[in-house]
């Protein structure tokens, strides 16, 4: 089975994705890492730098292209926080496997974003809309298209045991 994780920035897509992939012995694909490995250069070494250089539309096209070219075998895929706002990216994964929305209450997202900083895509979007509206739109979209909603407010992403427990809980949800 292929499992695709979506969620807001800081929801734990990468940390839980790695733990779950290890638990299930599946290959793990982090879309942000794949963007870097496919589009980095001497000038751009992070997905944030690539986003700034390419702009939103071209960056989104890159995400969709990568999703379309992933190997067909079962895997665990972690999407970017805004990936599913673009129809081409959704089309690339919609029949690929189980889409799981990692839900986190907004106050906790705000707290984490304040500590970690805003991703470039959010900074760009905030030129035309307030952050609360952007995040609410993303939540609504992910809830609408996700096969499963998995609350992760309680998960400590720096704790191996917490990630292992969340992995087991998510597997139980997927089997239900």
UniProtKB/Swiss-Prot annotation:
It is found in: Cytoplasm. Pathway: Metabolic intermediate biosynthesis; chorismate biosynthesis; chorismate from D-erythrose 4-phosphate and phosphoenolpyruvate: step 5/7. Substrate binds at residues 32, 81, 138. It catalyses: shikimate + ATP = 3-phosphoshikimate + ADP + H(+). ATP binds at residues 10-15. GO terms for biological process: amino acid biosynthetic process; aromatic amino acid family biosynthetic process; chorismate biosynthetic process. Its main location: cytoplasm. Binds 1 Mg(2+) ion per subunit. Transmembrane segments: none annotated. HAMAP family: Shikimate_kinase (MF_00109). Catalyzes the specific phosphorylation of the 3-hydroxyl group of shikimic acid using ATP as a cosubstrate. This is Shikimate kinase.
């Amino acid at each position: 089975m292929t499992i695709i994780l979506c969620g807001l920035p800081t929801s734990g897509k990468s940390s839980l994705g790695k733990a779950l992939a290890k638990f299930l012995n599946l290959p793990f694909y982090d879309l942000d890492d794949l963007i870097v490995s496919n589009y980095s250069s001497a000038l751009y070494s992070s997905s944030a730098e690539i986003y700034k250089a390419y702009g939103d539309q071209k960056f989104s096209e890159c995400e969709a292209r990568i999703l379309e070219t992933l190997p067909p075998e079962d895997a665990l895929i972690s999407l970017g926080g805004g990936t599913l706002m673009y129809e081409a990216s959704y089309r690339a994964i919609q029949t690929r496997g189980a889409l799981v929305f990692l839900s986190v209450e907004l106050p906790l997202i705000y707290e984490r974003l304040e500590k970690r900083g805003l991703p470039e895509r959010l900074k760009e979007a905030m030129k035309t809309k307030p952050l609360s509206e952007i995040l609410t739109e993303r939540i609504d979209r992910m809830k609408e298209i996700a096969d499963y909603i998995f609350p992760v407010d309680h998960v400590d992403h720096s704790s191996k045991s917490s990630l292992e427990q969340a992995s087991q809980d998510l597997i139980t949800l997927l089997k239900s």
